[in-house]
């Protein structure tokens, strides 16, 4: 199941960063790095994410096949404010924008079972 894959991948990212905070907390503090917000990671389809960008930030990218770097920054800001999470997972990018080996969603083949995991405005994991 795609959802199970996302559970594992999000879990790996969270665990990795929790260990980093535990083992390197003093160094992170020394450099003024803010503690990571580990709230429940919201999952949005690309279209849902673009709707949030439109409603919350006033940019209409709803016909685009991907997010802009500013979209990624803003979605992470939204996630932190609304969900107390520095992470957000974006799924279901258009099949036409992905490599041929990306699995189409059986429920809607126009979209793929692909994901980007964003952390503080940066795509840190991606796959299908």
Give short role names for the model-derived ranges.
Residues 121-128:
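Extended C-terminal subregions enriched in glycine
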């Amino acid at each position: 199941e795609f959802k199970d894959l996302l559970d594992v991948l999000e879990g790996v990212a969270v665990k990795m960063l929790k260990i980093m905070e535990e083992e390197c907390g003093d160094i992170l503090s020394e450099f003024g790095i803010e503690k990571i917000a580990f709230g429940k990671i919201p999952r949005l389809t690309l279209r849902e994410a673009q709707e949030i960008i439109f409603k919350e930030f006033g940019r209409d990218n709803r016909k685009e096949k991907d997010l802009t770097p500013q979209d990624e920054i803003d979605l992470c800001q939204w996630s932190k404010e609304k969900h107390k999470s520095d992470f957000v997972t974006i799924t279901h990018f258009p099949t036409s924008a992905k490599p041929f080996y990306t699995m189409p969603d059986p429920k809607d083949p126009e979209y793929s079972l692909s994901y980007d995991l964003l952390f503080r405005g940066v795509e840190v994991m991606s796959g299908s």
